Amino acid sequence: MRLYFYLTLTLQTFTFGANPHPVPKITDLRKPWVFARANEASLLFIEPQHKNSEPYAHIIQSGEKLQWFEFNGKDALIWDVTRFTETDKELTLYLKGGNKVIFTPYWDIDHCLLIIRFTPEASYNPTRFAIPYQYLKSLPYEKAEE
């Protein structure tokens, strides 16, 4: 499956600009993802783990509100994904509460979905977290209208 890069929320918009050049492969562990800050929020795409290792972080939990958990000693905010749609140009994750996250353009990845990270107090090095790809595959899927 492929994933996209411009990250948008419906209530507040944060932009993560991806380089149009080829993105590092999931197995290339030497190249860290780019760190960006926008609107006092931190967004990070983490280094992928080796294909045969455990997922890097926690699976999203259920619940109506955005949830906090502690990872590597720091607070991180995770989104509650309920379903997703996909076109040739973007991937949309729908969140509880009506918000959605849109990624564009995306890269080939086979075991781990992205890796979104958002911390309101964005002045420090944020906490990493990932959404395992197997979890994404278990969500209701709809082919979006082109």
Describe these PLM feature segments:
Residues 1-20:
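Classical Sec-dependent N-terminal signal peptides that target proteins to the secretory pathway
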Residues 43-87, 131, 136-139:
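N-terminal glycine/threonine-rich, aromatic-flanked beta-hairpin/loop signature
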Residues 19-36, 61:
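N-terminal helix-cap/turn-to-beta initiation motif at the start of protein domains
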Residues 55, 89-146:
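Beta-sheet ligand-binding and adhesion/scaffold domains
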Residues 3, 16-17, 32-34, 75-79, ...:
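A generic structural signal for ordered secondary structure
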Residues 28-33, 63-67, 87-93:
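Short, hydrophobic/aromatic-rich segments at coil-to-beta transitions
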